[in-house]
Amino acid sequence: MQAQTQVKGLKELGLEPSEIFHNLSYDEIYEHEKKNGETVVSSNGTMMVDTGIFTGRSPKDKYFVDEPSSNGNIWWSHINFKVSEAIFDELYKKCVNYLSHKKLYVFDGYAGANPETRVSLRVVSEKAWQHHFCTNMFLRPTKEELVGLDPEFTIINACGIKNENFKQHGMNSEVFVIFHLAKKICIIGGTEYGGEMKKGIFSVMNYKLPLQGILSMHCSANVGQDGDTALFFGLSGTGKTTLSTDPNRKLIGDDEHGWDDNGIFNIEGGCYAKVINLDPKTEPDIYEAIRKDALLENVVYDPQTKIVDYSSAAKTENTRVSYPIFHINNIQVPSKGGHPKTIIFLTYDAFGVLPPVSKLSIEQAMYHFLSGYTAKVAGTERGIKEPTATFSACFGAAFMTLHPTKYAKLLGEKMKKHNVRAYLMNTGLVGGSYGVGKRMNLPSTRKIIDEILNGNIEKSEFVTHPVFQVAYPKTISGVDSAILDPREAWTDKAAYDQTAKKLGEMFIKNFKQYAEGSKDFDFTAFGPKI
């Protein structure tokens, strides 16, 4: 593709590049990456990139401009930090000056697979591999759409500059990811990491959509042969991607979705999967998606053969691959589904006290959605490993731009309107806490999900848990009944009672932030009772 000297709208942003490459094809991107020396080709033709110092997002460097049109809506917190208009203007000018007279890549596309509610977007970058990342991850326009595309939101990625004055500005570091919601612009500096662009647009959608009555969600979604849509929520390591990939169901998307008056839609046009310890036997879909046009990040490979070692975390545990969604065979086209019939919250309970599966009322679903619980195992200074609870509102607090209760309220309204069933699944430990309990085996978990999705679970007799107040089934066809009652699965019943109480108290303590001063969200009655 020949370089252009101007693309509509760039001059208005203050950008005057020497050359512009606009929505390149994959073959053209490949040539640019090679020519620029940005990537290495793996043994099977997949491009590999080293993202530099940053191999993950920089959550403490994410800011929103404190301006009148949005400051009353934003959830100002340890996740969304304030920055002044003056600081934004100073750094914006720095970004524009840095990028002007350079060769730039411009990606124009969309976020949101529903044409009625999608957001047009633009990403300007100096690196061909970042253009590649955007081409993989966002919705790619047709040639006809590209001609008339007027981007509503723009990301200017000046990853090659740093904010040396961050201390005077009262900011966290030289890195910055700043959103100006009134001007509909995001500027990025100091980090090359691709996920900043992906989650940047998600943060914008998490602001914009709920204000229009559309629920934005950090979840995966699939659809059955009868057109029944299911949503899977869960923090990292709970099995969200693995469990929503099902040979009998078509994938709508693996990470970001919206729920509007027509149903569910994918916000993205691609997948961004973790590849540490990737095994072709357990995750064949992801393994087979890693081919030409995919982009591997920070993986270790043999310098001679260029064969990737997925078991190595020498650079980072957060090794990733981005690829367009059509690299997965069993997908829903377009990436949309009807209103969900089922919602499944996944948690890895390292305390081993939650039932493998429980049924939730709408109020309980809102409670657990706001709690966003999972538990990890962290080493203490004595070398003893014990679980630590993690609560992340809406199963994705890091990306929630509005107050979490806004999303929970919308969830409850939509569940009620469309008669949606919700379940809480423990994909973690049963029969004991870490060191004693065993992880729920994948075949049992998959069988439970099958019984949820085909409705057979509702034929079971349910028992209410004395602490967590959730209803769990006594029997499920094809699943060992001994594990369904979490207390019975423990040898030491007193230890179970003590641990269940301890986790229940953690839920209650965490939920105080939503109950206090909120008439709408005093859902403490629907959480644990000690």
Swiss-Prot record:
Its main location: cytoplasm. Pfam families: PEPCK_ATP. Binds 1 Mn(2+) ion per subunit. Gene3D superfamilies: 3.90.228.20, Phosphoenolpyruvate Carboxykinase, domain 1 (3.40.449.10), Phosphoenolpyruvate Carboxykinase, domain 2 (2.170.8.10). Mn(2+) binds at residues 199, 218, 255. One of its GO terms (molecular function) is phosphoenolpyruvate carboxykinase (ATP) activity. It is an enzyme of class 4 (lyase). Substrate binds at residues 57, 193, 199, 320. Signal peptide: none annotated. GO terms for biological process: gluconeogenesis. It catalyses: oxaloacetate + ATP = phosphoenolpyruvate + ADP + CO2. Its EC number is 4.1.1.49. GO terms for cellular component: cytosol. Pathway: Carbohydrate biosynthesis; gluconeogenesis. ATP binds at residues 199, 218, 234-242, 283, 320, 445. Keywords: ATP-binding, Cytoplasm, Decarboxylase, Gluconeogenesis, Lyase, Manganese, Metal-binding, Nucleotide-binding. PROSITE patterns: PEPCK_ATP. Involved in the gluconeogenesis. Catalyzes the conversion of oxaloacetate (OAA) to phosphoenolpyruvate (PEP) through direct phosphoryl transfer between the nucleoside triphosphate and OAA. Belongs to the phosphoenolpyruvate carboxykinase (ATP) family. This is Phosphoenolpyruvate carboxykinase (ATP). The gene is pckA.
